[in-house]
């Protein structure tokens, strides 16, 4: 079974992997083809049947003239990560400790960026933003070096800690990351698409959505 997936560049790589892994466990052999790009370009590819599914952090944009259906996979809060040295300086009294702390944030195309900045405003916190990144993996690499505190979906917090040698300095459910599968089908029939959507809702995001 050929499974062609477009991944919006703002979706964390680890999230994309966990969402797609169930498709590789199907009884029928699956050959997966992953393409990463801006959401608009991926939707254009899907419109001419070059992709079976697009993973995104937002539903189908209303201003794009492409036939597509958004299927919400789930949502979760965010966690803040820092090296042990940085966490020792800014890890106490969360979230007040983020005041003037060096912060790495997602680029302006990521939906969570706006939610995060609004939350800072509501908390009357002004971190010192030292970097903005469209690529979440690059943001984590900078964070691993101790340049600043960064965020990631809480659902992958343990994995981020292990992989990058960082600590969780705080977390909130007031800022959420949301993930969607966009397809041309309202009624899902492609076995890979069905596997991805079912596993996300029943396993990966089940606890987060029921918090």
Task: Report the location of each language-model feature.
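Central regulatory/effector-binding core of bacterial HTH transcription factors
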Residues: 1-62
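Flexible hinge/capping segments at coil-to-helix
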Residues: 68-107
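Hydrophobic hinge/microswitch elements
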Residues: 38-42, 47-50, 57, 109-167
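A late-sequence structural motif
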Residues: 15, 89, 167-211
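Beta-alpha-beta core module
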Residues: 63-76, 137-188
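Short, surface-exposed acidic/glycine-rich loop or hinge patches that mediate macromolecular interfaces
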Residues: 10, 37, 110, 186-187
């Amino acid at each position: 079974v050929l499974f062609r997936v477009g991944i919006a560049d703002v979706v964390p790589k680890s999230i994309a992997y966990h969402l797609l892994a169930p498709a590789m466990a199907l009884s029928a052999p699956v050959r997966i083809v992953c393409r990463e790009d801006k959401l608009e370009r991926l939707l254009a590819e899907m419109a001419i049947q070059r992709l079976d599914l697009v993973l995104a952090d937002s539903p189908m944009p209303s201003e794009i003239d492409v036939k597509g259906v958004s299927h919400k996979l789930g949502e979760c809060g965010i966690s803040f990560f820092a090296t042990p040295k940085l966490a020792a300086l800014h890890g106490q009294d969360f979230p007040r400790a983020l005041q003037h702390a060096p912060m790495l944030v997602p680029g302006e195309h990521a939906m969570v960026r706006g939610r995060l900045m609004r939350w800072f405003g509501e908390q009357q916190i002004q971190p010192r933003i030292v970097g903005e990144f469209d690529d979440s993996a690059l943001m984590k690499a900078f964070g691993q070096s101790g340049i600043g505190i960064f965020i990631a979906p809480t659902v992958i917090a343990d994995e981020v800690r292990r992989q990058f040698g960082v600590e969780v300095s705080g977390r909130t459910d007031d800022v959420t990351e949301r993930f969607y599968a966009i397809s041309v089908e309202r009624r899902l029939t492609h076995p890979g698409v069905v596997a991805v959507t079912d596993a996300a809702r029943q396993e990966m995001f089940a606890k987060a959505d029921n918090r």
